[in-house]
Structure formats: structure tokens, C-alpha cells
């Protein structure tokens, strides 16, 4: 519709835009959003045909101005996260030395490690005195990472880790979350793919039922479910999302790891899976929180007065973004910052600094604020967090951003040394 309309009074248009700019500057984005929503409602009430859409710009939902500082000692958390990453990879690599047929997945947890660690350190409540705690549906393919953290905590032994996927003698660990095989460890089974999201919706609904019938106190408990962007194509994954909003399941949080890759290649090579999922969930009545860009992009976005960087972020497809992260900083400078104006934006940055521009799902500050938004909203809706990451993060040539990442069971010596140095592992 907008392509058929013409600006018959540019001066009046500028006055409206200046007024909105003033509201943003002096009263903030929430006030501006309220005014725009009021205008849209008023226009519809008057019978004006309005453009409609359920997606927002390809940017983080939580603005820099609205961010809270992440509590705790981030240096300590970074070190713990690095050790967990290393041990998660080592579990699969050691099993592979015995027999490659044992399998296992390295790349999935490496892409999601920050999201799990922020949850463990700052949000998830365990069962304790007078409290039943939160419920977490872990994505099936990240099991080695959860085992690795449990080892650091002293909950699992090295002997158990060495017997990953070797359970015949009773000392091993199952491939995936499996409460029957490891009842004191896992809360829910989440494989095959798609079962976790579906079960989590009905689990959250059951908690509401128990509270409303006076059978149990479940207020304050959250149901968290982690899944992959490729997993969302399973019919079960999105099959009941309308029920979740209809039932007002504000105790439910989906965290979708959008690393842009599935079992056998790109999820949406010629599209944008985050935008697609945002449309699906927003249309079904969910709160949507997008975590796309890490803090190292903040300075560039602040410099982007004319919106050329935002436009470039919007027009690039997932296949492009995956390609960038399988190359290097020089390639990103040439192909992402592909106009004189964009190149000028990063003229003061080295190729290494461009390469270090991080994605939101790998930035604990951005992840923390997304989780905080999810647990503190009070509008009676479930929340989905769409976090952009890199499949095989840290694996280098053995898998980072590669189509083969999901099936990677081993890493060559050079990649392993690079992994060690990147995360400063003392081995």
C-alpha cells in the first residue's frame, strides 16, 4: 500500500517525524511506542487501512539504553564457561578415540554455551526448602555440555564422562536427556526433536492448573525450554504455541538457539529464520525478545546515523551470515561492509576487530537482559527468545560456521590448539 502513496506535504511530514524524534529523545522509546500504537488503533477505528506486520527490525529487542548490568564476577563466569566448553568437546573426542561410531555432537553446545551458563548462574532456581524450583527442558544435542558442567560442580565423575554413550556396565552416560536412564540428573526427555517444546507447553499449563485448583503452589516457577532453529520445523515444535498464549502461560519461556544450521545444512539459507519465527510467535500472541547483535556492534550502531548499517543487516540473508562466519575479518569487510559508506563506518577497525564483532547469543550481557525481560514481564503471555549464534563456535576449521558442523565428531590438532588458545585453557 505504501508504494501507492505520495508525500503531498513534505513539510507536514517532517513536523510529524520531528515530533516523534523529540519524544524519543526526551521521553524514551516506551512512550514513543505507546503513542504509535494509539495512532494505529485510532486509525483503524476510523476505518483507515493500515499496513500490518508481525516482525520488527533485525535488531535486539532490548535497547542499549534499557539494558541492566549483569551481576556477579564476569571474569570468573568466563573462566567457568571456558572450562565447560573444553570438557564438553573432550567428552565427545574421547569417546571418538574408542570408536567413532559412538557419535556425539560438539557443535551444538558450543553455539549455546553462553545461554546455558547465564541461566545456571543467574536465573534457574533449583528445588529447595519450601520451593520446588524451575523446570528446564534441555535441547537434546547439548547433553555433553550439561554433563561437562556437572563434572565441574563435582556431580559427575571423570569415569562417567569417559563412558559417554557406553552404558552397558552401568557407569556410562546416555547420549541425550533421558530421565529413565539417569533419573537423578535429567528432568525431561527432549529427543526426538520437537518433543521438548510440545511437552513444555503442557507442563506449564499443568502448573497453572495445579495452582488454580489449590493442589500445589506453583506461582513463581518457570518452565524453560531450549530448542534449535532447525528443530522448529518439526510439526510438534510450533503445533501448540497458540494454546500457550490462549491459556496465558506467562510461566513459559522458549529459548531458540538460532545458529542458522540444521542437521544437514542451512535452516533458511535464502531467508531469515529469526524474522520468520518472530512472525509466527508474535502472531500467536507471544512476547518476542530478539538477541541478534553482541555488545561489540553497539558502537557501530550508535554511529549509524543514516541507517545504512541497519539496512544492510536487514537485507543480508542467513546464508550470507553463515558464510561470513566461515571466513575471516577481511572477507567480512569486503562483502558485508560492501559500500563506500559502510566501509567508512569501519575504517578505524582492523580485520581482527571486525572478525570479533559478536552475535547476541554469545554475549552474556545481552543474554542476561533477554532473560531478565522474559522473567519480569507481567502481561500474561509466554515469551520466546530468539538468540543468534554460530554453530560450532570456537571449533575453527573443524566446524565453526561449516555445514558439516552438526555431524562433527572430531577436531584436528590445529583446531584443538586454536580452541585451547581462544578460551585460554591451561593445558
Model-found features: residue ranges?
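Short internal beta-strands
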Residues: 136-139, 251-259
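Amphipathic alpha-helical packing elements
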Residues: 9-45, 49
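Cofactor-binding active-site loop characterized by glycine-rich and histidine/acidic residues
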Residues: 72-84, 88-98, 105-247, 270-271
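Hydrophobic alpha-helical scaffolding
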Residues: 6-10, 25, 29, 70, ...
Amino acid at each position: 500500500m505504501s508504494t501507492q502513496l505520495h508525500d503531498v506535504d513534505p513539510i507536514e511530514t517532517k513536523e510529524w517525524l520531528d515530533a516523534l524524534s523529540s519524544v524519543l529523545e526526551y521521553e524514551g522509546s516506551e512512550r514513543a511506542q505507546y503513542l504509535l500504537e494509539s495512532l494505529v488503533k485510532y486509525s483503524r477505528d476510523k476505518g483507515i487501512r493500515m499496513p500490518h506486520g508481525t516482525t520488527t527490525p533485525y535488531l535486539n529487542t532490548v535497547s542499549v539504553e534499557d539494558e541492566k548490568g549483569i551481576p556477579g564476577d564476569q571474569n570468573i563466569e568466563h573462566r567457568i564457561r571456558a572450562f565447560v566448553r573444553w570438557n564438553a568437546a573432550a567428552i565427545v573426542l574421547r569417546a571418538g578415540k574408542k570408536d567413532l561410531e559412538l557419535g556425539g555432537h560438539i557443535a551444538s553446545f558450543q553455539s549455546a554455551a553462553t545461554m546455558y551458563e547465564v541461566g545456571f548462574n543467574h536465573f534457574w532456581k533449583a528445588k529447595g526448602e519450601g520451593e520446588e524450583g524451575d523446570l528446564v527442558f534441555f535441547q537434546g544435542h547439548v547433553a555433553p555440555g550439561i554433563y561437562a558442567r556437572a563434572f565441574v560442580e563435582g556431580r559427575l565423575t571423570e569415569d562417567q564422562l569417559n563412558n559417554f554413550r557406553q552404558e552397558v556396565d552401568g557407569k556410562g552416560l546416555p547420549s541425550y536427556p533421558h530421565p529413565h536412564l539417569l533419573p537423578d540428573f535429567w528432568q525431561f526427555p527432549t529427543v526426538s526433536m520437537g518433543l521438548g517444546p510440545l511437552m513444555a507447553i503442557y507442563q506449564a499449563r499443568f502448573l497453572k492448573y495445579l495452582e488454580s485448583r489449590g493442589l500445589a503452589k506453583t506461582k513463581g516457577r518457570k518452565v524453560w525450554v531450549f530448542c534449535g532453529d532447525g528443530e522448529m520445523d518439526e510439526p510438534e515444535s510450533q503445533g501448540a504455541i497458540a494454546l500457550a498464549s490462549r491459556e496465558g502461560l506467562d510461566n513459559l519461556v522458549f529459548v531458540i538457539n538460532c545458529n542458522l544450521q540444521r542437521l544437514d545444512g542451512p535452516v533458511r539459507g535464502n531467508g531469515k529464520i529469526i524474522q520468520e519465527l518472530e512472525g509466527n510467535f508474535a502472531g500467536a500472541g507471544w512476547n518476542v525478545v530478539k538477541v541478534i547483535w553482541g555488545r561489540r556492534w553497539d558502537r557501530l550502531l550508535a554511529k549509524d546515523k543514516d541507517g545504512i548499517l541497519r539496512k544492510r543487516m536487514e537485507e543480508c540473508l542467513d546464508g550470507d551470515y553463515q558464510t561470513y562466519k566461515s571466513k575471516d575479518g577481511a572477507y567480512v569487510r569486503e562483502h558485508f561492509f560492501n559500500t563506500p559508506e559502510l566501509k567508512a563506518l569501519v575504517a578505524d577497525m582492523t580485520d581482527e576487530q571486525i572478525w570479533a564483532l559478536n552475535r547476541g547469543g554469545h554475549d552474556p550481557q545481552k543474554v542476561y537482559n533477554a532473560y531478565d525481560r522474559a522473567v519480569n514481564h507481567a502481561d500474561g503471555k509466554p515469551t520466546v527468545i530468539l538468540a543468534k549464534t554460530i554453530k560450532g563456535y570456537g571449533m575453527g576449521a573443524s566446524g565453526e560456521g561449516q555445514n558439516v558442523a552438526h555431524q562433527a565428531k572430531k577436531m584436528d590438532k590445529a583446531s584443538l590448539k586454536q580452541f585451547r588458545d581462544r578460551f585460554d585453557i591451561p593445558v
